[in-house]
UniProtKB/Swiss-Prot annotation:
Cofactors required: Mg(2+); Mn(2+)
Residue numbers annotated as active site: 250 (proton acceptor)
Species: Rhodopseudomonas palustris (strain TIE-1)
Binding of Mg(2+), residues: 251, 260
One Gene Ontology molecular-function label: magnesium ion binding
Function: Nucleotidyltransferase involved in the post-translational modification of proteins. It can catalyze the addition of adenosine monophosphate (AMP) or uridine monophosphate (UMP) to a protein, resulting in modifications known as AMPylation and UMPylation.
EC number of the protein: 2.7.7.-, 2.7.7.108
Residues that coordinate or bind ATP: 88, 90-91, 111, 123-124, 174, 181, 260
Reactions it catalyzes: L-seryl-[protein] + ATP = 3-O-(5'-adenylyl)-L-seryl-[protein] + diphosphate; L-threonyl-[protein] + ATP = 3-O-(5'-adenylyl)-L-threonyl-[protein] + diphosphate; L-tyrosyl-[protein] + ATP = O-(5'-adenylyl)-L-tyrosyl-[protein] + diphosphate; L-histidyl-[protein] + UTP = N(tele)-(5'-uridylyl)-L-histidyl-[protein] + diphosphate
Domain of life: Bacteria
Name recorded for this polypeptide: Protein nucleotidyltransferase YdiU
């Protein structure tokens, strides 16, 4: 029985300059590592069939579903601030789109499926380590409630890829609301192809912002919609200590999802200047720089849309600048509301912003673990007089000691009882995030020993990040000095 993919493909209806038609390159011996069964069901797929040898053939690219229309998408992008007019999918091939059980159109893409016309000098393949990292982190982000691409499957290819060091090859099946990027708009704008910019904008409106079609200025509504989603998204990243690592415009999703998990990482000790990515030598994409970089990326999108916003360029620029001016308000509102909730503040008072920021200052001065400090504060919410377990996380607790009485006084003014407040705080302060040293241990077990038991266990832990279980206590702990991962790699 054939594994059926109910593809309904819309992107291939766009002009041929939007993509290159290309088939995946077959692999030697596909072996399914992991299938995301709940996601498969949500997509209208049969997980039992996908777990058969034939399923592995499809998920590796060796066989193509009948209704697939495989393409590599064209896009450009600013990489660390430098514009590259042609990038495109160099190792990812979009099989097609399905409409899931919620009526949402989703892309199904094979990452590591072989060379495409956009591969440049690359081999089009993916190594096992980065595939496992993306699977773990994208699924963890989904469980944390943060918009993200998803991972449907991971497959070993039976081949090796030439990386440093040589690694087993793998293919990730990625699911996204779409793979339209800011860089997709830049690809056509850089060529002066206004007709294609308009066609792409119309497609993005129909797919992601249908309400914009009814607005007095649909393209302005599109821009404002993307600005709003990116503001909310980055605010959510900041709440869990997530550092994307490569916030290039080609990694900025118009749908408002986290996309392209390369050298991403979750911060341990709180420091706004934290950088893990080996290729971010000057800290452009450091944790604390992510909000202004998001605005920078959105400004590049606005530049592409100027000619659609008004016939006169000066007027179009003025309209775009006004829209971009709304980013700070949207981001700050989301950021401060989320941060207040993490501190157990569910009503608003004038000094709340200062109280929230002073806790972050105390974390930085005390070199405290970001995730664990908020979680232990949640645990202490029932009896705020005893903050010993929180205080113990600070190498220098002086700033925390100064802050704690003000927090106690502030939460005493909240209408909720202590138990309700604690439950609410635990719903926004995870016990578990994908800590870098844990991911590294999973990758080492898989790559060095073909042992995927740690991979399965970390997925189980991270599927319920807000629910503490005694047997998973080690996953909540920061790394010991010898376990610290100071640098992460793109893996491409």
């Amino acid at each position: 029985m054939t594994a059926h993919f109910p593809f309904d493909n819309s992107y291939v209806a766009l002009p041929p300059n939007f993509f290159a038609r290309v088939a995946p390159t077959p692999v030697a011996a596909p072996r399914l590592i992991k299938l995301n069964r709940p996601l498969a069901v949500q997509l209208g797929l049969d997980p039992d069939l996908l777990e058969t040898p034939e399923g592995a053939e499809i998920l590796s690219g060796n066989q193509m579903p009948e209704t697939a229309a495989s393409i590599a998408m064209a896009y450009a992008g600013h990489q660390f601030g430098n514009f590259v007019p042609q990038l495109g999918d160099g190792r990812a091939i979009l099989l097609g789109e399905v409409v899931d059980r919620n009526g949402v159109r989703r892309d199904i893409q094979l990452k590591g499926a072989g060379r495409t016309p956009f591969s440049r000098m690359g081999d089009g393949r993916a190594a096992l380590g980065p595939v496992l990292r993306e699977y773990i982190v994208s699924e963890a982000m989904a469980a944390l409630g943060i918009p993200t691409t998803r991972s449907l499957a991971a497959v070993l290819t039976g081949e090796t890829v030439l990386r440093d060091p040589i690694q087993p090859g793998a293919v990730l099946t990625r699911v996204a609301s779409s793979h339209i990027r800011v860089g997709t708009f830049q690809y056509f704008a850089a060529r002066g192809d206004l007709a294609s910019v308009r066609a792409l904008a119309d497609h993005a409106i129909a797919r992601h912002y249908p309400e914009a079609a009814q607005a007095p200025s649909p393209y302005l509504a599109l821009l404002e919609g993307v600005i709003g989603r990116q503001a909310e998204l980055v605010a959510s990243w900041m709440m869990v200590g997530f550092i994307h690592g490569v916030m290039n415009t080609d990694n900025c999703s118009v749908a408002g999802e986290t996309i392209d998990y390369g050298p991403c990482a979750f911060m341990d000790t709180f420091d706004p200047k934290t950088v893990y990515s080996s290729i971010d030598q000057f800290g452009r994409y450091a944790y604390g720089n992510q909000p202004p970089i998001a605005l920078w990326n959105l400004t590049r999108l606005a530049e592409c849309l100027v000619r659609l916003l008004a016939d006169d360029d000066d007027k179009g620029i003025e309209i775009a600048q006004t829209a971009l001016g709304g980013f700070a308000e949207r981001f700050n509102a989301a950021y401060l509301a989320k941060l207040a909730a993490k501190l157990g503040l569910f009503t608003s008072q004038p000094d709340d912003q200062q109280l929230s920021q002073e806790f972050l200052t105390a974390l930085a001065k005390g070199e405290a673990d970001f995730t664990l400090a908020f979680r232990r504060l949640s645990d202490a919410a029932v009896d705020p007089s005893d903050l010993g377990e929180v205080r113990a996380l600070f190498a220098d607790p002086a700033a925390f000691d100064e802050w704690a009485p003000r927090w106690r006084a502030r939460i005493a003014a909240e209408p909720q009882d202590a138990t309700t407040r604690q439950a609410a705080m635990r719903r926004v302060n995870p016990a578990y995030t994908p800590r870098n040293h844990r991911i590294e241990a999973v990758i080492r077990a898989a790559v060095d020993r073909d042992d995927f038991a740690p991979f399965e266990e970390i997925l189980t832990v991270l599927a319920n990040p807000f629910e503490e279980k005694a047997e998973f206590a080690r996953y909540a702990e920061p790394p010991q000095p010898h376990e610290e991962v100071l640098e992460t790699f793109c893996g491409t």
